[in-house]
């Protein structure tokens, strides 16, 4: 399951970058079972179990308490690194993007593009206005698996769902147009949980391409972490490796530090602002507070400053 990124690598939902989509879905399942849930994703648990990664299936189904995966290096229960906060983290993230799409479509946007859609089931669970077209873009194996699994569950999309089975490193704009996408119409775009898995220059290309394909009035939502302070990158890698080691003790072999791209990069919000987008941003720490969740610990500065950004192309 574990592997370091390399040129031209591919994956399914049980390997490499693909399994992070399954992790995210497991967290959505956990968040859905919370006493006062912020989100309601009833497709998350069955999709995770269909993938079949044992640890994630047990987390999604409630058979494993995520606190069992914590250790003393996570700090207190309020730490963003603590697995017991995994569901809270994903709840506020999911709610943010859900509300972004619902607000965009209420404003009259009828064309939606979800980049790196993974096990995202928004095309099935959100109350889309009539006439909305949702394009899901991801690796062919990921698209095929989710489409089949949801059909087996008897699920029906609540919008017109069009799949675009293409690697984002390939000519995905051509594939998107071939599926019926019209760049002359305003679009609601999401790049959720994506930017950190791209090299810095690829992130810029992606944001440039989104801008090129956006008619005035288009909207975009994404999230990004600040560049690490001097010396912080190695500490972050060590922490990720420690978490991966604990996962291995439960039979889940994934090297998170080998999947993301480190190094200096343009932060998404100022980069987009310089390319014609009028933006708003909020930190994940602010989202926790706004949703009545216990605050993150002060030692989680970088995670607490994760910036959620949305805006309109002018």
From Swiss-Prot:
Binding site for S-adenosyl-L-methionine: 138, 167-168
Classification via InterPro entries: Ppm1/Ppm2/Tcmp (IPR007213), SAM-dependent_MTases_sf (IPR029063), SAM_mthyl_Trfase_ML2640-like (IPR011610)
Keywords: Methyltransferase, S-adenosyl-L-methionine, Transferase
UniProt entry tagged with the keyword Methyltransferase: yes
GO MF assignments: methyltransferase activity
GO biological process, one term: methylation
Enzyme class per UniProt: transferase
Catalytic activity, EC: 2.1.1.-
Family: Belongs to the UPF0677 family.
Function: Exhibits S-adenosyl-L-methionine-dependent methyltransferase activity.
PANTHER family: S-ADENOSYL-L-METHIONINE-DEPENDENT METHYLTRANSFERASE YKTD-RELATED, S-ADENOSYL-L-METHIONINE-DEPENDENT METHYLTRANSFERASES SUPERFAMILY PROTEIN
Record protein name field: Putative S-adenosyl-L-methionine-dependent methyltransferase MAP_4191c
Taxonomic source organism: Mycolicibacterium paratuberculosis (strain ATCC BAA-968 / K-10) (Mycobacterium paratuberculosis)
């Amino acid at each position: 399951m574990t592997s370091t990124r390399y040129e031209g690598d591919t994956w399914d939902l049980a390997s490499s970058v693909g399994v992070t989509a399954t992790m995210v879905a497991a967290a959505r399942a956990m968040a859905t079972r919370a006493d006062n849930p912020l989100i309601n994703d009833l497709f998350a648990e069955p999709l995770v179990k269909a993938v079949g990664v044992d640890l994630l299936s047990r987390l999604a189904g409630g058979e494993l308490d995520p606190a069992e995966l914590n250790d003393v290096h996570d700090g207190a229960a309020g730490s963003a690194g603590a697995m017991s906060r995994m569901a809270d983290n994903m709840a506020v993230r999911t709610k943010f993007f859900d509300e972004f799409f619902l607000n965009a479509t209420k404003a009259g946007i009828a064309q939606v593009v979800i980049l790196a859609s993974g096990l995202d089931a928004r095309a099935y669970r959100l109350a889309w206005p009539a006439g909305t077209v949702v394009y899901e873009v991801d690796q062919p194996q990921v698209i095929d698996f989710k489409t089949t699994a949801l059909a087996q569950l008897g699920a029906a999309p609540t919008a017109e769902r069009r799949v675009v089975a293409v690697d984002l490193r390939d000519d995905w704009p051509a594939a998107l147009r071939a599926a019926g996408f019209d760049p002359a119409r305003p679009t609601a775009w999401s790049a959720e949980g994506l930017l950190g898995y791209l090299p810095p220059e690829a992130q810029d290309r992606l944001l440039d391409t989104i801008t090129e394909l956006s008619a005035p009035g288009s909207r975009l939502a994404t999230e990004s972490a600040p560049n690490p302070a001097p010396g912080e990158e190695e500490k972050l890698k060590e922490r990720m490796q420690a978490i991966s080691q604990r996962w291995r003790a439960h039979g889940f072999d994934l090297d998170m530090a080998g999947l993301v791209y480190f190094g200096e990069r343009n932060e998404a919000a100022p980069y987009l602002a310089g390319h014609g987008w009028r933006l708003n941003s909020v930190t994940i720490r602010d989202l926790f507070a706004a949703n009545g969740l216990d605050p993150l610990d002060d030692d989680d500065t970088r995670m607490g400053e994760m910036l959620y950004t949305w805006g309109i192309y002018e």
